[in-house]
From Swiss-Prot:
The keyword Chloroplast applies. The lineage of its organism: Eukaryota, Viridiplantae, Streptophyta, Embryophyta, Tracheophyta. Pfam families: PsbT (PF01405). Keywords: Chloroplast, Membrane, Photosynthesis, Photosystem II, Plastid, Thylakoid, Transmembrane, Transmembrane helix. GO terms for biological process: photosynthesis. GO terms for cellular component: chloroplast thylakoid membrane; photosystem II reaction center. This is Photosystem II reaction center protein T. Belongs to the PsbT family. Found at the monomer-monomer interface of the photosystem II (PS II) dimer, plays a role in assembly and dimerization of PSII. PSII is a light-driven water plastoquinone oxidoreductase, using light energy to abstract electrons from H(2)O, generating a proton gradient subsequently used for ATP formation. It is a single-pass membrane protein. PSII is composed of 1 copy each of membrane proteins PsbA, PsbB, PsbC, PsbD, PsbE, PsbF, PsbH, PsbI, PsbJ, PsbK, PsbL, PsbM, PsbT, PsbY, PsbZ, Psb30/Ycf12, at least 3 peripheral proteins of the oxygen-evolving complex and a large number of cofactors. It forms dimeric complexes. It is found in: Plastid, Chloroplast thylakoid membrane. The keyword Thylakoid applies.
Length: 35
């Protein structure tokens, strides 16, 4: 159970950092795919 908690915290922190950097910079590739 501890392993699951640690992995969840690790993935959540990495996801927050990734989204922070992703939304801070202009997503040119994402806009091209969506449009």
């Amino acid at each position: 159970m501890e392993a699951l908690v640690y992995t969840f915290l690790l993935v959540s922190t990495l996801g927050i950092i990734f989204f922070a950097i992703f939304f801070r910079e202009p997503p040119x590739i994402l806009t091209k795919k969506t449009k």
